[in-house]
From Swiss-Prot:
EC primary class: hydrolase
GO-annotated cellular components: cytoplasm; nucleus
Origin organism lineage: Eukaryota, Fungi, Dikarya, Ascomycota, Pezizomycotina
Domain Helicase C-terminal: from-to ranges: 371-518
Protein name, UniProt field: ATP-dependent RNA helicase dbp2
Catalysed reactions, semicolon-separated: ATP + H2O = ADP + phosphate + H(+)
Alphabetical list of Pfam families matching this protein: DEAD, Helicase_C
PROSITE patterns: DEAD_ATP_HELICASE, HELICASE_ATP_BIND_1, HELICASE_CTER, Q_MOTIF
Motif placement: Q motif: 137-165
GO molecular function: ATP binding; ATP hydrolysis activity; RNA binding; RNA helicase activity
Assembly and oligomerization: Associates with polysomes.
Length: 565
């Protein structure tokens, strides 16, 4: 096998001219044919094992809803990847590839170590590892090629975020990277732009080649948002991409993979399905990204991640991004990253974004609806506001949505039992402000990139303090301020101590009744969850009566006559 070489022959100009026209990302077409009866819905088992309808997609109106998504810890999940062949890697025989592109800008080189230290201190930035490059303070200093730089400036960004300032030199240097930063900090662009540079320095894909860049994400929503960023910034280089995730037909994804894509953004389960079926391979992957690594481990994806990485050459560049740095994530980094360099933005202790005003009210369950309405009346006085309401279960999400709509509020709900087409529609209605109230379960607590959410309302308190921080992190993004309102009941008293710690660190007011709970309950909190949390029964109802419209009952409920917005 001949060497790829490292020379300029594969730089962007030759790549572009040889690639002739192919256009940007393929988009994911939904593959639904006329109408699309979901038929009688399958039973669950395994994550995603709940069938999304036993009947085909053809034929008039949607039939019964498919079975539920099932639990992540079922048998199907543990068997995923059993059919993948163990790879034996001989590095001497593998084609060589380029991964080091960073040249330090003169202005960066001239800064004293004291200037660098002050910049890092100002941005609460800590670095670890051998020979960590200095941070950059402007886009020009990052050293991106002009075709990347022009795309960035066209988006109107002022200057790099903290994670980008330090993360870009690290990723462009070809080193393995760990980045720890809060959601909404600009992590996606931190690895996307170096990925584009990396692709344009590699040989073109040959027929049958898999992707060059693989990005693993925990949820469909996050995967779709990453795809949007890659499509936007990779357009000028004609970089092709596809998004591979469950809950939708495989056909369009298979077609994209068979045509050849430089970037594959995937959730672990569906990617393993594709690998086992021989629809793609990972032999060409030289740039691997694990986004929201902590969330993927929380959801029980560790065995699948390990199986996927076993299919990728060991001298690849790996970038791991996470909002937290628990021991499980540290172990994953130790196992799969070589001589990595790390940047942490903010405190390593669990803490909330200080731009968010946190209001915690101790209430009883029967008070919640009235208090929610009172808050919404105040929030929606400003028609530009958007409110994301979190509930503990899918059933309550639907009940609350139906209640709000009947009361005249333009609310819609999103959770794992809803079909992907409906979820996409709800997200778009919320993003565009047509429906400024969205009710969600924790499926939406990470990865939903709606940057102008002004308020988060925790109707039900989550299972642990990490999920609380990630939920409220949906507001106060990209430098904006936000407000988080949380209903806390005596049933949540074991979480009181952790919550008070977070509120105190962020210098927030504390409800005296909450402080009293800490004193009298001795509440120690539930820790940080664990892998077993997502295990569970498959099943799901399936077989509901068909309706002519595309959406579930809660989102189809008519708005009451007393329009509230």
């Amino acid at each position: 096998m001949s060497s790829y070489g490292g020379g300029g022959g594969y730089q962007r100009d030759s790549y572009r001219s040889r690639n002739g026209g192919g256009g940007g990302g393929y988009g994911n077409g939904n593959g639904y044919s006329n109408g699309g009866g979901y038929g009688g819905g399958g039973g669950g088992g395994g994550y995603g094992g709940g069938g999304y309808g036993g009947g085909g997609y053809g034929g008039g109106g949607y039939g019964g809803r498919g079975g539920g998504a099932g639990g992540a810890g079922g048998d199907r999940m543990s068997n995923l990847g059993a059919g993948l062949k163990k790879q034996e890697w001989d590095l001497d025989s593998l084609p060589k590839f380029e991964k080091s592109f960073y040249k330090e800008h003169a202005d960066v080189a001239e800064r004293s170590q004291r200037d660098v230290d002050e910049f890092r201190k100002k941005h609460e930035m800590a670095v670890q590892g051998r020979n960590v490059p200095r941070p950059v303070e402007t886009f020009d200093e990052a050293g991106f090629p002009q075709y990347v730089l022009s795309e960035v400036k066209a988006q109107g960004f002022d200057r790099p975020t903290a994670i980008q300032s330090q993360g870009w030199p690290m990723a462009l240097s070809g080193r393995d990277v760990v980045g720890i930063a809060e959601t909404g900090s600009g992590k996606t662009l931190t690895y996307c732009l170096p990925a584009i540079v990396h692709i344009n320095a590699q040989p073109l894909l040959a027929p049958g080649d898999g992707p060059i860049v693989l990005i693993l994400a925990p949820t469909r929503e996050l995967a779709v948002q990453i795809q949007a960023e890659i499509s936007k910034f990779g357009k000028s280089s004609r970089i092709r991409n596809t998004c591979v995730y469950g809950g939708v037909p495989k056909g369009p994804q298979i077609r994209d993979l068979s045509r050849g894509v430089e970037v594959c953004i995937a959730t672990p389960g569906r990617l393993i399905d594709m690998l086992e079926a021989g629809r793609t391979n990972l032999r060409r992957v030289t740039y691997l990204v694990l986004d929201e690594a902590d969330r993927m481990l929380d959801m029980g994806f560790e065995p699948q991640i390990r199986k996927i990485i076993s299919q990728i050459r060991p001298d690849r560049q790996t970038c791991m991004w996470s909002a937290t740095w628990p021991k499980e994530v540290r172990q994953l980094a130790s196992d799969f990253l070589n001589d990595y360099i790390q940047v942490n933005i903010g405190s390593m202790d669990l803490s909330a974004n200080h731009r968010i005003t946190q209001i915690v009210e101790v209430v009883s369950d029967f008070e919640k609806r009235d208090k929610m309405i009172k808050h919404l009346e105040k929030i929606m006085e400003n028609r530009a506001n958007k409110c994301l309401i979190f509930t503990g279960t899918k059933r309550i999400a639907d009940e609350i949505t139906r209640f709000l709509r009947q009361d005249g509020w333009p609310a819609l709900s999103i959770h794992g039992d809803k079909q992907q087409q409906e979820r996409d529609w709800v997200l778009n209605e919320f993003k565009t402000g047509k429906s400024p109230i969205m009710v969600a379960t924790d499926v939406a607590s990470r990865g939903i990139d709606v940057r102008d959410i002004t308020h988060v309302l925790n109707y039900d308190y989550p299972n642990n303090s990490e999920d609380y921080v990630h939920r409220i992190g949906r507001t106060g993004r990209a430098g904006a301020k936000g407000t988080a309102i949380t209903f806390f009941t005596t049933d949540n008293s074991k979480q009181a101590r952790d919550l008070v710690t977070i509120l105190t660190e962020a210098k927030q007011q504390i409800d005296p009744r909450l402080a009293e709970m800490v004193r009298y309950s001795g509440g120690g909190g539930h820790g940080h969850g664990g892998y077993g949390r997502w295990g569970g029964r498959g099943g799901g109802r399936g077989g509901g009566r068909g309706r002519g419209n595309h959406f579930t009952a809660s989102n189809a409920a008519p708005l009451g006559g007393n329009r509230r917005w």
